[in-house]
Amino acid sequence: MGLSTFVVGMLPSYDQIGILAPVALVAMRLVQGLALGGEYGGAATYVAEHAPQGRRGLYTSFIQVTATFGLFLSLVVILLTRKVMGEDAFQAFGWRVPFLVSILLLGVSLWIRLQLSESPSFQRMVDEGKGSKAPLTDSFGKWPNLKIVILALVGLTAGQAVVWYTGQFYTLFFLEKTLKLDGALTNGLVATALLLGTPFFILFGWLSDKIGRKPIIMLGCVLAALTYFPLFKALTVAANPQLAAAVASAPVTVVADPADCAFQFDPVGKTVFNSSCDLAKSYLAKAGVTYTNQAAPAGTLAQVKIGNETLTAFDGKGLEKAAFKAQKTEWETGLGAALKSAGYPAKADSALVDRPKVIGILFLLVIYVTMVYGPIAAMLVEMFPTNIRYTSMSLPYHIGNGWFGGFLPTTAFAMVAATGNIYYGLWYPILVASVTAVIGILYLKETKDVDIDA
């Protein structure tokens, strides 16, 4: 994983090697993902099997800290790089620096691993000849264990993943892309909230040894589902009050043929949405503008109504690349000017950002993250026997975080573009967290008193 991260900083640009550039980037990201697939389950299992009974939640919570602390450190490195190099240089080539510097961490990681020995539980299992000869078959080919794997996914890690991603990554996306805060300011605000919230991973890990893993994780999912809408609306008012005021004073409506409007789900960022409806909605969604939808007769071009002004979009289907780019630029310039005259800011005014309030809201969102994530490693370890523990716990964890969590920003943006409501994408984490809470409360067993060596 460390080597693939370093290589990302060395990749040629699209101008140099064309389509091979994004292909190489995706390949390196796949290598990172495959590496992480082996990292987390092994780390959680190793630490839990070394921890004394009654302290596994506390011990494994330090693993959970590393993900958020790593994000915090990455934000600090990005902030420093931006400050030292300047924004233009950072966008041009400075973004490579953090990836290149990561090679130093690879050396530290290798040194640590060379000092480790097998856990007592695993070594005893090997000595007694009780290890699984076919861990994949034993984990996923036998219903009694497969049932637990599925339950761990839908009743535990899926909800944990969307709460984790919403509290740490979607907030970054929402502040910078939707509310249009300055990138450096966004990184600083989120980094501050992460720093304040990080000790709570350990607190909730310790508390789970006292009252159980299940109530803390389920409560985190429930609180997130109940409060995301008011918290993100409050975040808008605190971070970009001009945008909040413009939405109230100059409502926007998109009048379009429903058949002309696509669901703009684009996980790799390469799909070209070129219908008049898609061009209108895509720009508004990226500008953080809330709008209502109104159906138009079939075959008509989409229109955007801003207060008393109406702008008609163009149809980019069938246009040559250069012509499409020119018309798109002209369209977006005109739409941007109309929004500006109606009071919609192109960027958030940093002087108007209520920093303490923003940090307070972000901190609360991070607390939800610590509730669902702090105790989860211990609980996953305790759900499976030693001979298939590593394999069995890794699948629900990574499917939950990779699929349910990883697709959150893309799915949320597509939902926002489809409906015109900048908060509508929150329904995705709310629904997933709610389903996890219901299934987890009804069917998950408490595991804190399980003897994992038995």
Give the location of each predicted region.
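Cytoplasmic membrane-interface "Motif A"-like loop-to-helix N-cap segments
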Residues: 1, 210-221
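C-terminal ends and interior cores of transmembrane alpha-helices
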Residues: 1-18, 222-242, 334, 338-350
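Hydrophobic core of transmembrane alpha-helices in multi-pass small-molecule transporters
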Residues: 11-37, 242-256, 352-371
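Loop-to-transmembrane helix entry
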Residues: 23, 178-195, 356-360, 423-427
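Multi-pass alpha-helical transporter architecture, strongest
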Residues: 109-116, 228-238, 431-454
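Flexible cytoplasmic inter-helical loops of multi-pass small-molecule transporters
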Residues: 114-136, 453-454
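Extracytoplasmic gate region of multi-pass secondary transporters
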Residues: 145-194, 231-232, 259-294, 298-299, ...
